[in-house]
Amino acid sequence: MTIQFLKNVKKQSYKGLFLTALACGVVPLQSCENTTTEQKNDVAVQEKPVRAHSITKGRAITNVKDVFKCDVPGWRVTAEGTLVGDDGREWVVPAKSSYQTGLKATDLFNECTGVLLENEDGLAVDEVPIIEIDSDGEVVTGYFFGDNYFEFFVNGKLVTVDPIPYWPFNTSAIRFKAKRPFVMGVKMIDWSENLGLGSELMRGVPFHTGDGGFVAIFKDKGGSVISSTDSSWRVQPYYISPLLDPSCVQADRTSKSCTVPPKSDAESAYGVHWDVPENWGLENFDDGAWQNATLYTNEDIGGSIQRPAYQNFTGLFDNPAHDAEFIWSENLLQDNLVLARKIIE
């Protein structure tokens, strides 16, 4: 069921129309099946159905102006904000993050810290911290490049966070110790300047819809590749914006057909949000409703991979023997918070 039926409902105010539709969860993300009833005066009263999703409209209130600052060309204001959905829930945009408290991954290329390795061979791997998940596990080294920000988990435990949440682009690594089978999880965030509107200033365009993208490769202690980002990863979006009309989002959260608001109405963009499950990083989490990751070429990702933060490490990520693929959900432009997971047997 989609919210398209709203167009066929007449003689209602916009507000009434909107709330009537949402009462049945018809932004097709959830039907009216999840309802409860209670007996009042011998009459069964149907309560308001419980919806998983929430819809927001317009720009967020900025709560944290400077999540990260860096005095180099290309740095962008990195802020966090909040806005309230149609159901009264408050949402952090672009997403709740552990940037302030999480362990920063070890730099391979970071203009803000001055670490500018020419290739991965310059990394002293033995000096990279090992985060222990299992005392009797194997040591794995992960190498990451995200557009824009990532948080990396193993068996639901936060292992490390991207040292730079927005711009400039960077490459990093971490080591962890885990026993198979273990679950690798990644929270991928496409940061934005226009909080709540899912857009940024780009080449003079004030409401440019930026893209995401994430690539990683994992090696054992001997240097052999045990995994890399590919289509076997399972992904699911949890924040979609900017949307001209939230009805475009399908029940499986597909948003490929969604259009972006025109520049003249960009401040009125909609967003659709879902709560992140607490157990999404655990082995027993059911990701059956998730999608397989969509693969993107270097050209799809665009300008970010033209920078030395990526180009210096093509021998690592684009090795023909073990080519790591850029992954995201089906909508590279409007899906701003995407979770990804992979079980290593």
Language-model regions: role of each:
Residues 40-150, 154, 169-345:
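Beta-strand-rich recognition domains
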Residues 161-166:
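Short, solvent-exposed beta-strand-to-loop segments that form ligand-recognition rims
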Residues 28-31:
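C-terminal motif of bacterial Sec signal peptides marking the signal peptidase cleavage site
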Residues 33-35:
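Bacterial signal peptide processing site
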Residues 23-26, 38-39:
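Compositionally biased non-globular segments, especially hydrophobic aliphatic-rich helices
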Residues 12-22:
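Sec-dependent N-terminal signal peptides
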Residues 1-12:
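N-terminal secretory signal peptides that target proteins for export/translocation
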